[in-house]
Amino acid sequence: GKALTMNGTRYVLVEFATSDAYSHIYRAVQDFVYAGYIPILAHVERYKAVFGHVDKIVELIETGAYIQINAESLIGGIFDKRASFCKKIMKEGLVHFLGTDCHDFRTRRPNMKPAAEVVRKKHADQILYENPRRMLEGKSI
């Protein structure tokens, strides 16, 4: 079938269950790429099979995926493992998009400002502006 793409481009936001095996995620990325889509993996920091494994993030990117993390996941103290992992993969240039996971304004409000302050130091223009603009225009990132 056809996937619902972003703004009529080849980009498609893909979400997996937190418990999905890495082999399932990897095969799905391959399938999307072979079908002509450009998958953006939503909130990869939640996937148990990927969390803490920079090598798997790299492999998914090399297979053709782009990586999106949630803004909330960047906001955490020094002992917050999720925030530490997200900051690490961002520092290594492995994050392409920042999302809010905001499904509505009553129960999940967007909280981009604190995360933007974390991102702003080095990657803000690319992650917050340039990559989303290029994606919406259907251009490569």
Features from the language model and the residues they span:
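Short active-site-adjacent structural elements
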Residues: 75-79, 105-110, 136
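Short acidic/histidine-rich active-site segments
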Residues: 94-110
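Active-site beta-loop-alpha junctions enriched in small/polar residues
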Residues: 17-19, 44-47, 70-76, 102-105, ...
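A short helix-to-beta-strand connector/capping loop
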Residues: 63, 93-94, 123
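Mid-to-C-terminal alpha-helical segments outside catalytic/metal-binding sites
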Residues: 112, 117-141
